[in-house]
Swiss-Prot record:
Residues of the TRAM domain: 380-447
Gene name tied to this protein: miaB
Catalysed conversion reaction: N(6)-dimethylallyladenosine(37) in tRNA + (sulfur carrier)-SH + AH2 + 2 S-adenosyl-L-methionine = 2-methylsulfanyl-N(6)-dimethylallyladenosine(37) in tRNA + (sulfur carrier)-H + 5'-deoxyadenosine + L-methionine + A + S-adenosyl-L-homocysteine + 2 H(+)
Record keywords: 4Fe-4S, Cytoplasm, Iron, Iron-sulfur, Metal-binding, S-adenosyl-L-methionine, Transferase, tRNA processing
Identification of the protein by name: tRNA-2-methylthio-N(6)-dimethylallyladenosine synthase
Pfam families per the UniProt record, alphabetical: Radical_SAM (PF04055), TRAM (PF01938), UPF0004 (PF00919)
Family to which this protein belongs: Belongs to the methylthiotransferase family. MiaB subfamily.
Length: 457
């Protein structure tokens, strides 16, 4: 009987990528298959996030729920990976003695050896070391589950923003060699992937050797140009970028590489220079706006999303007003916005914070309501237009329909003959947008590629 692994992922797309790799590693080493049901699993893994306190505490809450499964199934192994594991280490086992494995983002490739050691010794195994970029040398080829895929191009962060734990949980920035990344992307393209998202905590800080051991370095713009030349790749996305690393070379890439989508996620975090300085972000609002101005000179319709923190220590009403002014000026399509959550061990955790919680909550609600207005306005402006989408699979709303994504990352549901579904999935097609809804669009097929056209008849 095939053994199964269940992985629950918290946090960012880097963690989603790492979770897929955990499954790949265990499949290659032990033949385990992924399950979406923890009750069916022989191994349960939590890939954790420590960016906010709420996410961290939810891990321990979920661990408590699977404890009963372990009591009913003694051979079940429970593991905690990711940033909480890196930050807490062996204290996780002290708090939850039924946990068998604790591993960091850089040691997930050692899972088979840790499992063997746990079974042989009967003791919990903890490995939260930072062996640079070693894990990529030990990962099996990716198993593709659709026409889109994530590719991690670097690990860690060296920015040390005053509020952030990532440099402490993932280590400093280390880039994969260029040829390693290109080999992975080419392998994905051979399996039918048409869109890749290049991942890194500060992805545009990429500085990868041309090959292992080479002294020549490729920057992020060079990497994008090479990825665009790989046969089969039709779209390139990346996340998360940092304003401080947005070079003119990267800006020029938006003119040179049409496959680079017309959407950018560029976290600003705040709209007040005073708060940005306290956050140690390393740029001013004017410098941030300058990057966007240059990009929109090349791509006038570039859509923009961001991250924002409300209620950072010392934030005044004037600071918040400046944030809202920036939101209106930039016209953000989406914002991942949260109330500041102090993280132990970060400089900002020691700052005086005298803003009442209810004030922070009102500010957050105002910010999110404004962003939602932007989202609705942009979605409505797309009605009547023809959009190029990548068909990802059956619609969640109606399995008799198909769904795909626009360049600005909106889901479009559209009807198509059932017999055409297998051939349409993975194709780039054109749809006319007929309706805009709060979280999706609806359209109709108007133009397809030759292959897809044949599939509809």
């Amino acid at each position: 009987m095939t053994k199964k692994v269940y992985v629950k992922t918290f946090g960012c797309q880097m963690n989603e990528y790492d979770s897929d790799k955990m499954v790949d590693v265990l499949n290659a080493a032990e033949g385990l298959e992924k399950t979406d049901t923890p009750e069916d699993a022989d191994i349960i893994l939590f890939n954790t996030c420590s960016v906010r306190e709420k996410a961290q505490e939810k891990v321990f809450s979920d661990l408590g729920r699977v404890r009963e499964l372990k009591e009913a199934k003694p051979g079940l192994l429970i593991g905690v990976g990711g940033c909480v594991a890196s930050q807490e280490g062996a204290s996780i086992v002290s708090r939850a003695p039924y946990v068998d494995l604790v591993f960091g983002p850089q040691t997930l490739h050692r899972l088979p050896q840790m499992i063997d050691a746990r079974r042989a010794s009967g003791r919990a195994q903890v490995d939260i070391t930072f062996p640079e970029i070693e894990k990529f040398d030990h990962l099996p080829p990716a198993r593709v589950e659709g026409p889109s895929a994530f590719v991690s191009i670097m690990e860690g962060c060296s920015k040390y923003c005053s509020y952030c734990v990532v440099p402490y949980t993932r280590g400093d920035e280390v880039s994969r060699p260029l040829d390693d990344v290109l080999t992975e992307v080419a392998g994905l393209a051979d399996q039918g992937v048409r869109e890749v998202t290049l991942l890194g905590q500060n992805v545009n800080a990429y500085r990868g050797a041309l090959a292992a051991g080479s002294s020549e370095i490729a920057d992020f713009a060079t990497l994008i140009e090479y990825v665009a030349d790989i046969p089969g790749i039709e779209r390139i996305r990346y996340t998360t970028s940092h304003p401080k690393e947005f070079t003119q070379r990267l800006i020029d890439t938006y003119a040179k590489v049409p496959k680079l989508v017309n959407h950018l996620h560029l976290p600003v975090q705040h709209g007040s220079d005073r708060i940005l300085m306290a956050m140690k972000r390393g740029y001013t609002v004017l410098e941030y706006k300058s990057v966007i101005r240059k990009l929109r000179a090349i791509r006038p319709d570039l859509s923009l999303s961001t991250d924002m923190i409300v209620g950072f220590p010392g934030e005044t009403e004037d600071d918040f007003d400046k944030m809202m002014a920036l939101v209106h000026e930039m016209g953000y399509d989406t914002s991942f916005s949260f109330i500041y959550s102090p993280r132990p061990g970060t400089p900002a955790a020691n700052l005086a914070d005298d803003t009442p919680r209810d004030v922070k909550l009102k500010r957050l609600q105002h910010l999110q309501a404004t962003i939602e207005e932007n989202v609705a306005r942009i979605s409505q402006s797309m009605v009547g237009k023809v959009e190029r989408i990548l068909v990802e699979g059956p619609s969640r709303k109606d399995p008799n329909e198909l769904a795909g994504r626009t360049e600005n990352n909106r889901v479009v549901n559209f009807p198509a003959p059932l017999a055409s579904h297998p051939r349409l999935i993975g194709q780039m097609i054109d749809v006319k947008i007929n309706h805009a809804y709060p979280h999706s669009l609806r359209g109709e097929l108007v133009i397809v590629s030759d292959d897809a056209s044949a599939a509809t008849h």
